[in-house]
Amino acid sequence: MKELEVRTASSAYPVYIGEGIRKQAAALLSSLNRPLTKILLIIDAEVDRLYGDEMFRLLNETWPVKKVIVPSGEEAKSLKEYERIQTEAIAFHMDRSSCMIAFGGGVTGDLAGFCAATFMRGIDFIQMPTTLLAHDSAVGGKVAVNHKLGKNLIGAFYQPKAVIYDTELLKTLPEQELRSGMAEVIKHAFIADHAFLEKLLTFDTLQGLTSAELNEMIYKGISIKSAVVREDEKEEGIRAFLNFGHTLGHAVEAEYGYGRITHGDAVALGMQFALYVSEQVARCKMNRKELTQWLIGLGYPGSIRQDIETPVLSARMMNDKKTRGGMTQFIVLKELGEARDCMLSKDELENLLNKWRMEETA
């Protein structure tokens, strides 16, 4: 089992990574030395089918546990599900020494974390991610639900008390979900670690990754994010660099319809555009075409659906929470392994997006 500490201005907590460590969950929770009266286990429906009974039994040997099953997919991050979970918590007579555990992917973690942040003005919560994508979202304390007008518009910064990452659970992931999660690993390399990026570039497929390779990628990705969050917990500075690929990525997700394209595929499209902007605006020296072809070779899409018009996408991007005074903060690369931001107007963004889309479909 690997262990690292995430330290922020407001808290510090352990991240445990290893195969089969879900079976040690009760012992790991006890080692935190937190008062714990009850557990609300918030679990993804598909994860519940595979591991729900086992996890309930393991925890229920030590504490009273109530299981709440949430839908798989982005639709779970709704105000309706948020209210349902809070109702379950109240009916279970949870108090301020109770705990919520998120057992699922990033969606489950976002939802459970926001519920914990707001129940009785904040109770403990634990992240138990079950997807590769969640290696990113489980660390750093961003929790939220969606609004019909945009993703993650209702949320908070609220750190978990621990992250328990059982990599054995990744073995049941379909290739599409593995690829989705790998996009965030690649993002971390692009913005913060050239040597790690060079290592990733040696992989021409995501099939057949060994447990050791996955564990190392997860550890490296979380280490990079932890270092960023340590310096900037609430996205007032360099934490914004973690949004590399996400400005367009979130717009693509919204226009395709949540669940119609994976988060990772959308972010990969966003990174391809961000590489183009890095070249055009930040004068980043790189072999962009080669990097783009590598991403496509791993199975990521190389262009956005033609029926989605550029002005619609640029309007979505300008509605991003990083927009200030008619300018949106866009993350680019100064060089491979080092990020910076730039401010773009709607016209500049639209012009760059038009040129990139014409190039990608040429």
Curated annotation (Swiss-Prot):
- Per the record's keyword annotation, is Ribosomal protein included, yes or no? no
This protein's pathway = Metabolic intermediate biosynthesis; chorismate biosynthesis; chorismate from D-erythrose 4-phosphate and phosphoenolpyruvate: step 2/7
Its GO biological process annotations read: amino acid biosynthetic process; aromatic amino acid family biosynthetic process; chorismate biosynthetic process
- Keywords of this entry: Amino-acid biosynthesis, Aromatic amino acid biosynthesis, Cobalt, Cytoplasm, Lyase, Metal-binding, NAD, Nucleotide-binding, Zinc
Q: Give the enzyme's main class according to its UniProt record, as a single word.
A: lyase
- Tell me the SUPFAM superfamilies matching this sequence: Dehydroquinate synthase-like
| GO molecular function terms attached to this record | 3-dehydroquinate synthase activity; metal ion binding; nucleotide binding
**Cofactor stoichiometry and binding remark:** Binds 1 divalent metal cation per subunit. Can use either Co(2+) or Zn(2+).
EC number assigned by the record: 4.2.3.4
Q: Where is this gene product found?
A: Cytoplasm
Report the leader peptide range: none
Residues in a coiled coil are none
User: At which positions is NAD(+) bound?
Assistant: 72-77, 106-110, 130-131, 142, 151
UniProt record similarity statement: Belongs to the sugar phosphate cyclases superfamily. Dehydroquinate synthase family.
Xref: PANTHER family: 3-DEHYDROQUINATE SYNTHASE (PTHR43622), 3-DEHYDROQUINATE SYNTHASE, CHLOROPLASTIC (PTHR43622:SF7)
Q: What does this protein do?
A: Catalyzes the conversion of 3-deoxy-D-arabino-heptulosonate 7-phosphate (DAHP) to dehydroquinate (DHQ).
* Protein name per its UniProtKB record: 3-dehydroquinate synthase
Annotated organism of origin = Bacillus velezensis (strain DSM 23117 / BGSC 10A6 / LMG 26770 / FZB42)
Gene encoding the protein: aroB
